[in-house]
């Protein structure tokens, strides 16, 4: 099964959700002072959504830095986004933005830590996605 590249802030919400998937994970660094990592295989990106309800600033800066590297951008195959339903139409909007800019499918959205149903849906969805 393919690699999951993800960003999780200090809140660790995205990280804790992904640990439940029991898949290969590659975490993007928190700070801008670290070099941009390079991946060498296709991956699905998982990102939280920032910005308090608007689309400006919705994609975390470390995710933008990572995707601005052409070699990383060429290997993205899909995106999953976390968000907060309190932000209405902007819920998980980082996924919409990455999907549009990278021309990849937006596979799933979940709220904060996700539910057990979200975990099952993502596990099953990724299995189908990588074996199609």
UniProtKB/Swiss-Prot annotation:
It comes from Agrobacterium fabrum (strain C58 / ATCC 33970). HAMAP family: NrdI (MF_00128). The gene is nrdI. Belongs to the NrdI family. GO terms for biological process: protein modification process. This is Protein NrdI. It comes from the Bacteria. Pfam families: Flavodoxin_NdrI. SUPFAM superfamilies: Flavoproteins. GO terms for molecular function: FMN binding. Probably involved in ribonucleotide reductase function.
């Amino acid at each position: 099964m393919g690699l999951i590249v993800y960003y999780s802030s200090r809140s660790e919400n995205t990280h804790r959700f992904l640990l439940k998937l029991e898949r290969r994970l590659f975490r993007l660094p928190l700070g801008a002072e670290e070099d941009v990592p390079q991946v060498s295989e296709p991956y699905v990106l998982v990102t939280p959504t920032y910005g308090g309800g608007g689309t400006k600033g919705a994609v975390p800066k470390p995710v933008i830095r990572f995707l601005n590297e052409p070699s990383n951008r060429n290997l993205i195959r899909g995106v999953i986004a976390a968000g907060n339903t309190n932000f209405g139409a902007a819920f998980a909007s980082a996924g919409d933005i990455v999907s549009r800019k990278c021309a990849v499918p937006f596979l799933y959205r979940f709220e904060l830590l996700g539910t057990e149903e979200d975990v099952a849906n993502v596990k099953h969805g990724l299995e189908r996605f990588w074996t199609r």
